[in-house]
């Protein structure tokens, strides 16, 4: 089924989207370990760089639950039970956003030298981020 190294990352994202989290983790690991485990049988030809990008997509769009809807950043994160934390940065409208996801909360920090605010949506509820401040959102 997964003849391409680009397939497992998308299946991981969709697994989280439809609630099949066991498969989501399996596909994420297959994507992340494609070269270490030589899943495609051709690692000696070079690393699967696009699969590395797909693994990043699994982290951000899958486990981080990041989407853009109505010109706003939205998040519906999910972490596997054995994960304590997930952290990543996004570039949004010229500024960095640091995202930390823990089992019961998300911490969002708009890293900007400018005085600005940015609306985000987490599990369908709106929050205002202020530059230079961390916003902790329980879930």
Place the predicted regions along the sequence by residue.
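Generic helix N-cap/helix-start motif at coil->alpha-helix transitions
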Residues: 2-8
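Non-catalytic C-terminal accessory modules of carbohydrate-active enzymes
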Residues: 5, 13-139
